[in-house]
Amino acid sequence: FAMWDSDVNEYNIVDATPYGRDVMRELKDACDRHGIHFGVYYSHAFDWGEANGPGNDWDYENPGGNLGLFGGLKWYDEHPELLPRIRTYINRKSIPQILELIKKYDPDMIWFDTASKLPPEECLRILKKVREAKPDIVVNSRITYPYPFPGRTGHFGDYLSTGDRAVEFLPRDGDWEAIPTTNESYGYHKHDHSHKTPTYLIEVLAKAAAKGGNILLNIGPRGDGTIDPVDVNILEKIGDWMKVNEASVREAGTTTLTVQPWGQSTLDGNRFYLHVFDWPEDGKIQVGGLETNVKAARMLADPDQTPLTHQRLDSMTVEITLQGSTPDIGHAVVVMDVNDASKTDDTRLVSTKIETLLHGFDSRIIGADYKYGDGKARRDYIEVGRNTDQKLVWEIYLREPATFEVSAEYQRIEEPGVFTVTCGTFESTATTEGKPVDEWFSTYIQQDMGRLSLPAGKHTIELAPAEARPDALMRLRALHLKPQ
């Protein structure tokens, strides 16, 4: 369904609804008036309302997903006889409407979606037409289905779009963007009351910025065009936080520091922005892995820019005494200027006071044949156990001796399998527990792995499968270290 006045197909908001207004034109004109770049969404590969389109209402019982596609996800390999019909759809509707959008509305960006529903060569044919029509238009990676390179996945877009609703992120090369929603729906859903808090979404924004990513936050307008008051409140609260802390995410990006006990950091030149998700009880944070000298520190929200007291505790750790308290919405940000931000150590400081979550996405990944979750809730995992050469490694350090309860957070895959967690002389072997994975509704379990006592200094924690399975042993989310 076209949300603009389309001359290509009469199934559009002007010709097919009583509303009769070209909202695309109105949005484009408003963006031009306010100096905002204008982008459009176009589902080039999935069309419920077109007889020749993949996933249409006539041929499939579930137009919203892959299960009803003839032959499954790669239906075009199973049923090549359908390709002429699909090519007709692309030639008569998909490409003409895309070119129409470019000509009539001159968007700065086209956000494509559901490329897996088309053969790759058809997606590339569409991309070629787009580049010919407007060479400098920005196109996301969902124009085509990803393809494998040795050690990585490639795409033909100008930047990478993550999976839907990702809130945890693997380290990535190049430009990328995550697309979380305020609840669990992209369109308006009156029964979906799973809205995240503004504070949660601000943390997602900071975590993405720390790894060089952008956030495209989705809300679903109601049928009359108004925005759900719950969404309005979320956006206003995020806006309030951004008015004070904008520089920490808009001007800053990929950090050279590792994950911290209290949160994350972003970096602009030799200026770190320390995002304090968990305000310490004693009002002091320890910055781990920092080998350069600190020149100055202050609270970003402090209009007087009062210097914060800081001291070096050892060659890798600096302690900063905070001022004020954590805000009601969002989190506090510390500005920390240093001599040389490249002088850091990836060894992660582990707190002896609060629980540490060693996320799989933040591990050093050894071996091959891994599969990764897309980062959304309950799907932020690494599949471990396709071969016994696989290993997830976390390098940590402690400033004082401590004892921890260790637990593994994961989802079991198929039959129980054996894995180990080791750290120096500590070795804990366990058999996976819980119910086998249900693709969409699985929850993680936390399995006790025993008590780990460590002296001050550097240590290496490893998780590895003790046996291999074709479908892996587990979907590992994290290891937990709880001080005793």
Kindly label every feature range from the protein language model.
Residues 404-406, 459:
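A short tyrosine-centered beta-strand micro-motif
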Residues 1-400, 411-439, 447, 451-453, ...:
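Mature catalytic domains of secreted/periplasmic carbohydrate-active enzymes
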